[in-house]
Amino acid sequence: MLMRTDPFRELDRFAEQVLGTSARPAVMPMDAWREGEEFVVEFDLPGIKADSLDIDIERNVVTVRAERPGVDPDREMLAAERPRGVFNRQLVLGENLDTERILASYQEGVLKLSIPVAERAKPRKISVDRGNNGHQTINKTAHEIIDA
C-alpha cells in the first residue's frame, strides 16, 4: 500500500479539487524534425482520448489542445501525480510550410502532425535572359549555370 508522505502534494490535490486547477504545470512534450519534403511534430499525450484533442490553425500559428478529466471526487486518491485538466501548446510555423495541407494522426498516446514544405520554398530553376546570346538556366540547388 502507498503511504502519503508529502503534505504539499496533498495541498495541491486540495487546491485542484476546490479551484478546478492544479498548482503543477501541465506539460505537452514534443519533438520536431524535417523529413524529406515535410516538417514533422510529435506530441506526447499519454492517457488522452482522441476525441478530446482539438487542433486549430490561424495564419501560421498551430494550437493543440487536449484534456484529461479530473479524478472522481468520490475516489480517495493515494497518489495523483498525472496532470489533469486542459493542456495547450502553440507552434509558430515558418512561411515556408504549407499550412493548408497539414495532416494529423493519433496513435498510442502520440499526436503526429505532418506539415508539407510549401512549393514556393522548394528549390527551382530560374531562366535568365542573356540578351542576344540566348537564355541561361540557374539551378538554385547545385549553384550551376546551364546554357539553353
UniProtKB/Swiss-Prot annotation:
Listed SUPFAM superfamilies: HSP20-like chaperones (SSF49764)
Listed InterPro entries: A-crystallin/Hsp20_dom (IPR002068), HSP20-like_chaperone (IPR008978), Small_HSP (IPR031107)
Domain called sHSP: residue spans: 21-131
Pfam families recorded: HSP20
Gene3D superfamilies per the UniProt record, alphabetical: 2.60.40.790
Entry's family note: Belongs to the small heat shock protein (HSP20) family.
Role played: Not known. This protein is one of the major immune reactive proteins in mycobacteria.
Protein name: 18 kDa antigen
